[in-house]
Design a protein with these regions (language model features):
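Glycine-rich phosphate/dinucleotide-binding loop and adjoining beta-alpha-beta core of small-molecule
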Residues: 1-64, 135-149
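A general alpha-helix detector
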Residues: 12, 31, 80-81, 106
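Short, well-ordered loop/turn and helix-capping segments at boundaries between secondary-structure elements
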Residues: 22, 76, 87-88, 130, ...
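Short, well-structured alpha-helical segments that form the helix of a local strand-helix-strand
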Residues: 28-36, 92-106, 121-129, 144
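Short, small-residue alpha-helix embedded
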Residues: 15, 71-102
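Charged C-terminal helix
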Residues: 105-149
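Short beta-alpha connecting loops at secondary-structure transitions
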Residues: 16-17, 62-69, 79, 83, ...
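Active-site proximal loops enriched in glycine and acidic residues that flank catalytic Cys/His/Asp
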Residues: 8-10, 45-47, 54, 63-64, ...
Length: 149
């Protein structure tokens, strides 16, 4: 019961708690806590100011990310990032926080480079690699096609 990470957006959270999206958004911290009480594990309440809550009382607000992330597949990419971090033996809460931060920073870098409109989940891949590997030196081919800077 405690070995899970739940990653709802506000609409999914509202369905899980039997309330309205407005109620979820009116107090995101309380909503994450309510989800945690009901489902245990770690809760990642996605959205503006993503809330990560763990059963041990830890709570983090991830302020990275932007409105361009409100597109199909973004949650799948986030889950994949978190899963990869779990595969590297991070604890649930730490993997959720690190995954949300990397995901959000990659989206912010991408938005600064090409704008938020029309952002696709697959657009994050090349930027994400550079976000999690900041010391990698880019080649001329990288710079001409998909520069991080």
């Amino acid at each position: 019961r405690h070995n899970r990470i739940l990653t709802p957006h506000p609409g999914e959270a509202a369905r899980l708690l039997g309330c309205s999206v407005a109620e979820i958004e009116s107090d995101r911290l309380l909503s994450a806590q309510r989800l945690l009480q009901r489902y245990a594990g770690v809760v990642v309440l996605k959205g503006a100011g993503t809330v990560v809550a763990g059963v041990d009382g830890k709570v983090s607000i991830i302020d990275a990310g932007n409105a361009g992330m409100a597109s199909g597949g973004m949650g799948d990419v986030l889950s994949g990032i978190i899963g990869a971090l779990l595969g590297q033996k991070l604890e649930l809460y730490d993997a959720a926080c690190a995954g949300c931060l990397a995901h959000g920073v990659a989206a912010d870098v991408l938005a600064a480079r090409q704008g938020m409109r029309g952002m696709l989940a697959t657009d994050l891949f090349s930027t994400l690699v550079r976000v999690v590997n900041p010391d990698v030196i880019e080649t001329e081919d990288d710079e001409s096609s998909n520069s991080f800077t």
